[in-house]
């Protein structure tokens, strides 16, 4: 009997142990289960690039978006429209009409202060240059970019022009003054950081001879840019002798310090991995970092007290030539992205949200494209997560079906705070009827969003980013 009781007791203890272990296993979330979108995620749609001419049709489209759970529409507020008449001569009437239409539909409105040119890039269907009077404010050498072959690019003001910050500050101030009355429908504001609204150089521009999957070209060949590079190197090392020691060169004058004279050779001959190459690439990115700090500070100064919402900027998804053995990461570096860790830290320092693109794309890392967009999304997202930088996403090209599933995977895995789809006509026809893609967008993206319980008037976060 004693033996029976002992065995029975041991059996009960074993059973209890198994039950407790099973309970602990069930109660502990797996890595997959713990991955989730952010609590405040919202789904948004990008409006047309060009001006609205048929407001009746546009309002029907907006109503369809609202009825299907879309939170906000994101809009380029073109500098070339609002300040075209002259310096500090603003006309915001078109965008007030636009905001009224959005408000009437019960949607939120996310403006992008678009200080870049529209036209000439993938997906551009309009031609909106920068205000023409800008040319009287400085020299072309100061205000424009110039690439390896001498092509001068005026898609956006060069960050190296001393007047860039002042012009943006005046634009931001006027926007805040004119749209303070619309703050109930503005949950976020985006800043254009450069070409196509992205914080980058205009390295891949078809008019300059670029075509996919070309690496693009460095944009540091104005005298202003060359002198800035020389000054930065002299400041870093303290003297030409110390520069020569670091680089293993025999320069006799600071004027002999130049950006790479042969962009292809810079990679194929290994120059990118030399002390000189690393210094150049680091400086080249630092120009963008400083620019982000300038526009971020101006935006916070003008917007925080008026709107009290998050402000964001954009990094481009330069996903090709990433694993090219002869030119690794050459496309990213021509665009100004050398060290993502350092660049994303600047977003943290400037208190800006980060938007990234190409969430719908899959890797295909073979020649000639060497394209790794999914890997790039993971890299950027992981760094942002580690630094506590809020993430928002967008598609690079028109998408649907499996692309929506890929987007769902990324926004869930990395806790994205929102997603904006390019572009409204992909989801809604001009007569307001849904396209075949709207159901997929609802299933995979809108279904992740949180209901707006503020009657269309509360401030929440949404997102926008421009192509990759």
UniProtKB/Swiss-Prot annotation:
Domain of life: Bacteria
Its EC number(s): 3.2.1.2
Biological process according to GO: polysaccharide catabolic process
Catalytic activities: Hydrolysis of (1->4)-alpha-D-glucosidic linkages in polysaccharides so as to remove successive maltose units from the non-reducing ends of the chains
Bound cofactor: record note: Binds 1 Ca(2+) ion per subunit.
Binding site for Ca(2+): 83, 87, 170
Coiled-coil region(s): none
Keyword entries, A-Z: Carbohydrate metabolism, Disulfide bond, Glycosidase, Hydrolase, Metal-binding, Polysaccharide degradation, Signal
GO molecular function, one term: metal ion binding
Required co-factors: Ca(2+)
SUPFAM superfamilies: (Trans)glycosidases
Residues the record lists as binding substrate: 76, 116, 124, 314, 319, 357, 395-396, 423
Pfam family, one: Glyco_hydro_14
Disulfide bonding pattern of the chain: 118-126
Signal peptide stretch: 1-36
Location of the active site: 198 (proton donor), 394 (proton acceptor)
Regions that span the bilayer: none
Homology family: Belongs to the glycosyl hydrolase 14 family.
Name of the protein this chain belongs to: Beta-amylase
